[in-house]
């Protein structure tokens, strides 16, 4: 890898663009987005305007030639079958099996496969089918040449609500050094403790 990576990304299972909001605040640029839900696309368009980068459609049928070269692919795939509130059918379930559509996209990209992948989902993904689903997902990424790590972040660090989310970071070798930046961890000014500190400092 010569020189720093271009900080652009493709947002799969884009929804209304929450991943995009966070990454753009960190200096990343959107290059492509995809979601199957037309209603979410309408909200996405209302918020961001530039819909030329948004492809509405089933990820299982996505034409990968539409996807530009990017440094990062994000996937907040459906949690319905992984959540404790759901039927716990796991990655074989009708909704959460969309993860395999994402894996197929990465596979079909071949040499254009992004050097970094970020998955986001409920913490229940770790224990779905006694951990077999999480293991299978990591193995699938390993087979595509990615080294994988995972961590949980609680939303209480940012907003007045405790909500744990699982993040899986997958990278190809020697990629992190090419980013040429120091990771930063932000805490929202909207948290009650922050508000009180500013009001009564």
Language-model regions: role of each:
Residues 4-8:
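Extreme N-terminal starter segment of soluble prokaryotic enzymes
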Residues 38-42:
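Short alpha-helix immediately C-terminal to the canonical SAM-binding loop
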Residues 50-59:
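Conserved SAM-binding strand-loop segment of SAM-dependent methyltransferases
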Residues 62-72, 80, 84-201:
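Class I S-adenosyl-L-methionine
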């Amino acid at each position: 890898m010569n020189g720093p990576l271009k900080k652009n990304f493709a947002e799969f299972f884009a929804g209304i663009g929450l991943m995009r909001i966070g990454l753009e605040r960190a200096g990343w640029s959107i290059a492509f987005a995809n979601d199957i839900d037309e209603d979410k696309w309408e909200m996405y368009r209302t918020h961001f305007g530039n819909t030329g980068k948004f492809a509405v459609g089933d990820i299982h049928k996505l034409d990968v030639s539409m996807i530009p070269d990017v440094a990062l692919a994000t996937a907040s795939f459906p949690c319905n079958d992984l959540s404790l509130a759901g039927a716990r059918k796991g990655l074989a379930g009708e909704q959460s099996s969309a993860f395999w559509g994402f894996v197929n996209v990465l596979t079909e990209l071949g040499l254009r496969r992004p050097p970094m992948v970020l998955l986001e989902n409920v913490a229940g993904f770790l224990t779905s089918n006694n951990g077999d689903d999480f293991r299978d997902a990591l193995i699938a990424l390993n087979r595509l040449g990615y080294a994988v790590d995972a961590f949980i972040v609680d939303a209480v660090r940012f907003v007045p609500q405790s909500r744990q989310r699982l993040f899986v970071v997958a990278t190809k070798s020697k990629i992190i050094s090419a980013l040429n930046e120091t990771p930063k961890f932000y805490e929202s000014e909207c948290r009650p403790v922050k508000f009180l500190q500013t009001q009564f400092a």
